[in-house]
């Protein structure tokens, strides 16, 4: 899989979690787990909001992102809000 496809899948996943306000659990490479809502993201970071606080998490420190509800990939993507 080429890098552009991988980034596109990341974008679809994170954007769906953000737009649909699906809570996620982010597992870091050091073993910590953070739960919250995705507020934004770019090529290198994810902004997670939890208990009214925002955290900027670097993607290189992320092991796994688990949505707490299913994210449907077969729905057509709408333009960015």
Swiss-Prot record:
Protein function: RNA chaperone that binds small regulatory RNA (sRNAs) and mRNAs to facilitate mRNA translational regulation in response to envelope stress, environmental stress and changes in metabolite concentrations. Also binds with high specificity to tRNAs.
Entry-linked NCBIfam families: Hfq, PRK00395.1
Descriptive protein name: RNA-binding protein Hfq
Gene Ontology BP annotations: regulation of DNA-templated transcription; regulation of RNA stability; regulation of translation, ncRNA-mediated
Gene Ontology cellular component annotations, sorted alphabetically: cytosol
Coiled-coil stretches: none
Pfam families in the record: Hfq
Taxonomic source organism: Clostridium acetobutylicum (strain ATCC 824 / DSM 792 / JCM 1419 / IAM 19013 / LMG 5710 / NBRC 13948 / NRRL B-527 / VKM B-1787 / 2291 / W)
Keywords carried by this UniProt record: RNA-binding, Stress response
Protein's gene: hfq
GO molecular function: RNA binding
Assembly mode: Homohexamer.
Keyword RNA-binding belongs to the record: yes
Transmembrane segments: none
Sm domain sequence ranges: 11-71
RNA-binding recorded as keyword: yes
Top-level taxonomic group: Bacteria
Protein family per UniProt: Belongs to the Hfq family.
């Amino acid at each position: 899989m080429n890098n552009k496809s991988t980034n596109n899948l990341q974008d679809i996943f994170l954007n769906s979690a953000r737009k649909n306000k699906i809570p996620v659990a982010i597992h870091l490479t050091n073993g910590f787990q953070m739960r919250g809502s995705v507020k934004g993201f770019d090529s290198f970071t994810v902004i997670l909001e939890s208990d009214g606080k925002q955290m900027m998490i670097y993607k290189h420190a992320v092991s796994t992102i688990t949505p707490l509800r299913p994210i449907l990939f077969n729905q057509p993507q709408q333009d960015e809000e």
